[in-house]
């Protein structure tokens, strides 16, 4: 990861705290929120689920009265998607700002962070039978011209090569034009917390042992007993996948722990790779060192940007 620090040109209206699993990002986010009259918005793809507490590391005791959003917003077994996250983020961001508080986005789910920081335009656009009937007699060139008129900022030229994709692109572009764009203008300050690889591995293994002692096996048993299928638990990955296999008798307890521990280490590497990709794509991440008072480093960054 680069050591370069880039800062926003305008005063931030969103603080983003990101990092790999077990990096201490939640603790840092809560500490900063407490000093900023802030509220936490979670950017974790599994913490949205009710009852999936220990395995997802909600660690709600760390919040110490700081309000939080996008945790426990969907039932276990439900498939929560990126569009739903973005819609709920927008609602939470708007609500927090309207009350004069400061939004602090905290998480490690790269796609969720990316969709906020890069402003993905995700819209649930219904099919428009009348529009499709109108477009049906048009040639490919005529359809392409209409799409460019509807979306002058078109960047994805692949939409121009297949008729069905072209019609759908027009449908989306014209729907958005009528509905307007309610995405806020964000000026984020993004802070990442990182550790040396060996230190992070040690933290991951230590935390996994603690979660096992806290009742993570029983949590998965309870979720299954309440109707979350083994297949759904498998879908949620990592802790839920390997504990489900253990509970089904496919793995011994020792094998389950070793395989899960290894999988979490691999996941942390993938997160770090995603953050590098975010930087390559132009997102400025200001890194603080986890083993050297990350709060003081983050406060120094905030002082320079407020």
Curated annotation (Swiss-Prot):
Which segments does the entry list as coiled coil? none
Superkingdom of the source species: Bacteria
- List positions binding substrate: 21-26
- The site feature described as Interaction with substrate tRNA is recorded at 109
Q: Name the segments for region: Interaction with substrate tRNA.
A: 44-47
Alphabetical keyword list:
ATP-binding, Magnesium, Nucleotide-binding, Transferase, tRNA processing
Assigned EC number = 2.5.1.75
Single GO MF annotation = tRNA dimethylallyltransferase activity
Q: Which InterPro entries match?
A: Dimethylallyltransferase, IPT, P-loop_NTPase
Q: What broad class of enzyme is this?
A: transferase
Has keyword Transferase?
yes
Q: Which cofactor does it need?
A: Mg(2+)
Q: Which Pfam families match?
A: IPPT
Q: Name the GO terms of the biological process aspect.
A: tRNA modification
Tell me what reaction this enzyme catalyses.
adenosine(37) in tRNA + dimethylallyl diphosphate = N(6)-dimethylallyladenosine(37) in tRNA + diphosphate
Q: What does this protein do?
A: Catalyzes the transfer of a dimethylallyl group onto the adenine at position 37 in tRNAs that read codons beginning with uridine, leading to the formation of N6-(dimethylallyl)adenosine (i(6)A).
* Entry's family note: Belongs to the IPP transferase family.
The name on file for this protein is tRNA dimethylallyltransferase 2
The organism that produces this protein has a lineage beginning with:
Bacteria, Pseudomonadati, Thermodesulfobacteriota, Desulfuromonadia, Geobacterales
Gene it is expressed from: miaA2
């Amino acid at each position: 990861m680069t050591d370069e620090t880039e800062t926003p040109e305008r005063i931030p209206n969103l603080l983003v705290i990101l990092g790999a699993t077990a990096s201490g990002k939640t603790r840092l986010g809560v500490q900063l929120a407490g000093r900023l009259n802030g509220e936490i918005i979670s950017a974790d793809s599994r913490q949205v689920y009710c009852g999936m507490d220990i395995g997802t590391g909600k660690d709600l005791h760390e919040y110490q009265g700081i309000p939080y959003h996008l945790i426990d917003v969907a039932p276990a077994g439900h498939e929560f998607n990126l569009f739903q996250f973005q819609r709920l983020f927008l609602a939470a961001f708007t609500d927090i700002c309207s009350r004069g508080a400061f939004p602090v986005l905290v998480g490690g789910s790269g796609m969720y962070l990316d969709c906020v920081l890069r402003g993905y335009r995700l819209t649930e656009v219904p099919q428009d039978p009348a529009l499709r009937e109108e477009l049906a007699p048009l040639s490919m060139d005529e359809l392409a011209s209409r799409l460019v008129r509807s979306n002058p900022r078109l960047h994805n030229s692949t939409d121009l090569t297949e008729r069905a994709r072209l019609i759908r692109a027009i449908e989306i572009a014209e729907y958005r034009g009528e509905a307007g764009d309610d995405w806020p203008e964000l000026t984020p300050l993004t802070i990442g917390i990182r550790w040396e690889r060996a230190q992070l591995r040690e933290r991951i293994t230590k935390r996994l042992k603690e979660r096992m002692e806290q009742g993570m096996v029983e949590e998965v048993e309870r979720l299954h007993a309440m109707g979350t299928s083994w297949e759904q638990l498998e879908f949620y990955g990592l802790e839920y996948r390997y504990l489900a296999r253990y509970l089904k008798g496919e793995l011994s307890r020792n094998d389950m722990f070793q395989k899960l521990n290894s999988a979490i280490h691999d996941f942390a590497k993938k997160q770090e790779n995603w953050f590098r990709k975010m930087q390559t794509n132009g997102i400025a991440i200001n890194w603080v060192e986890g083993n050297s008072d990350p709060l003081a480093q983050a406060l120094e960054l905030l002082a320079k940007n407020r």
